[in-house]
Amino acid sequence: DALGDAYEYLIGQFAAGSGKKAGEFYTPQQISDILSTIVTLDSQEPRTGVKQRLDSVMDFACGSGSLLLNVRKRMGPHGIGKIYGQEKNITTYNLARMNMLLHGVKDTEFEIFHGDTLANDWDMLRELNPAKKPAFDAIVANPPFSYRWEPGEAMADDVRFKSHGLAPKSAADFAFLLHGFHFLKDEGVMAIILPHGVLFRGGAEERIRKKLLLDGHIDTVIGLPSNLFYSTGIPVCILVLKK
């Protein structure tokens, strides 16, 4: 694993020197530790400690894969059935695949897809048969903050969004959240890093937030200070969701 650790170290050093571009592929280690700790605890009874096993872990904006590897580190090399990731940037996608292999993850133990999460262009996730719909025990994500997107009219009927509504074009934060939440198992845990604005912005975001709260899906909100990320100085939060 020393080779993998060295690779992660170099990615971190590169992120530190590349400023705003770093946000596209790197989650600082300390924040990664918090997320991986949360999703590996027993979701119904966190005090009992770490789950014995996770059948599947997903990061739909996986960057270099560091978050997924952190979850694996906590569960042990045989504690996860399969690791899934998705990444839009082809260079970063290749970084993630290399990162997995250098950490000793066999190519049969992970699947990383190069594609657009919001467009949901991964065939595996487009399964229409409810009995075969993929779902994950743990979902972690650090998606791009306040990403501008262009949802078409058909997107309002998308199974991921239709019960909550569409996030505004100016900020896809809740679109990313709802994408992940849709694929979370009933007993699973999702932890996502988002800008603080998702907690108080109005309009469509307020409606989505209110429904999530009223339905009891927001388990925990963890506020974090500003200047934790290389890519932005804004304060962020971790939202923990359960079904």
Where is each model-derived feature located?
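Short, solvent-exposed loop/turn segments at the edges of secondary structure
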Residues: 78-79, 232-234
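Conserved beta strand-loop-helix elements of the APE1-like EEP
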Residues: 236-243
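A short acidic, glycine-rich active-site loop
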Residues: 162-169
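Long recognition/docking surfaces used for binding and targeting
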Residues: 1-19
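Short glycine-dipeptide loop
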Residues: 184-189
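Short, solvent-exposed loop/turn elements at beta->coil junctions and helix N-caps
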Residues: 224-229
